[in-house]
Amino acid sequence: DNVIEELRRVVGHITKISMGETIRGTYGDYIEKKGRIAYFEPAVLTGSDEEGIEQELKIWAKYSKTDGGILEKIISYPPEVKLEKTLVLIKPDSFQELSSKVGNIIDRFSQTGLFIIGAKVIHMGVREAEEFYAPIKERLAEKMKGKLLKEIRSSLQGSLDFKLPQGIEEGIAEELKSYKTEHEFNKIIKFMTGIDPREVLDEEEKEEVREKCLALVYQGENAIMKIRKVLGETNPEEAAPGTVRKDFGLDIIKNGAHASDSSLSAEREMRIIQIEKDDIPEIVERHYGRIN
């Protein structure tokens, strides 16, 4: 409700006085010389009424195919720089309530000095999430065996009045490993999509979406290493102070953000989420009818 008024309030008016209470008051610039505007940087553009917003969105949709997309070959780098691109996903829990968490996470990544060359809100379905996270399933299996072994030993300790033969606990852990892995993997998929994959009955439901993420493409020298250093360890408890996961994560699933671990992973992940697909005309036409 009142989305236009609320956005205008947060963005703020054009002003020569930087008060820091609005986006423009913090990040905008307004300079006059001899009574005339010499420089104006609004920081953010937002619509003032429904009619104007419709016109502006139709302009965006009209030119998004030619002027939008990933900003390749826009930024000039020294010839010796070996460029890398990497993908960051800010996870669904950051969008489940009104907060500045997303902006704070992006601020933290800005410490890398890398450029954002692409940004897109995405909605993962079960099929897409399963493909995206497939590589971690094997790694999960080995982790789960060790975790299961601890749980089995803890559960059996003191509950039996005889000593188990050597290797029995390891055998039980090996037998249960695949079930535990599937259980943990399904928790990740449910978190990213809002849908429990065990409850999906047909292929159509695998395309359904309920949650959203923000996908960001960063570019620069050693982009993958720089982003992952700021991101921190998977488990927030093990992450270094000042990292995204230490400061914004709750557990190994709700840990703030995902980042690609190699150039090949970045390419694969960007392909899966279709980061370069232009959705703007479709979305605008769905709400306002034909663009032209």
List each language-model region with its residue ranges.
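Non-catalytic terminal and connector segments of soluble metabolic enzymes
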Residues: 1-292
